[in-house]
Amino acid sequence: MEESEDLRRATELWRAAYRYQMEGELDRAIEHYQRSVAVHPTAEAHTFLGWSLSFQGRLEEATAECLRAIEIDPDFGNPYNDIGVYLMQQGKLDEAIPWLGKAKQARRYEPRQFPFMNLGRVYLKQGRWWDALREFEGAVQTAPGDVHAAKTLHQLRGQLN
């Protein structure tokens, strides 16, 4: 019973942290995420803590939080995608590819199209146009209502024709 109460409290804390993060209050968000993982570590809290840290340019710490999230729940796809994005931000495109691939394969991931979009961006930067096209097609197939994904796919098709 105590563990479920801890999990409930930890979830409340990371949800509050997420709200602070969306309002741009990063320090307050980070504090709440840290309190959440102190009560009961969850993959979500570690991932979102990493995300907040990344907005402060603290990419090594952000990556470490994502690795902790993966240890807790290897089926949660968000930390794989986030590590891929942090590597992209550092110009480490080849290193980002396997992380984004793992995010695509994860059982639990929302929004599902993000790793496809990010992998497509990697391939564009590498000049791998047809690989990028396949990824953007995968993004649109995964999330047909995503206007940004559809627009990106349309633009790339136009450039390739």
What are these regions (language model features)?
Residues A45-H46, P79, Q113-P115, A149:
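TPR alpha-solenoid repeat register
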Residues D6-E44, F48, F55:
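Alpha-helical segment of the N-proximal tetratricopeptide repeat
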Residues M1-D6, A10, R121, K125, ...:
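Terminal, low-structured helical/coil segments at or just beyond the last alpha-helical repeat
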Residues R9, T42-A43, F76, R112, ...:
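Residue-level recognition of tetratricopeptide repeat
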Residues A38-V39, I72, A106-R108, T142:
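Structural marker of alpha-solenoid helical repeat scaffolds
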Residues M22-H32, Q56-R68, Q90-Q105, F114, ...:
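Structural signature of tandem alpha-helical TPR/SEL1-like repeats
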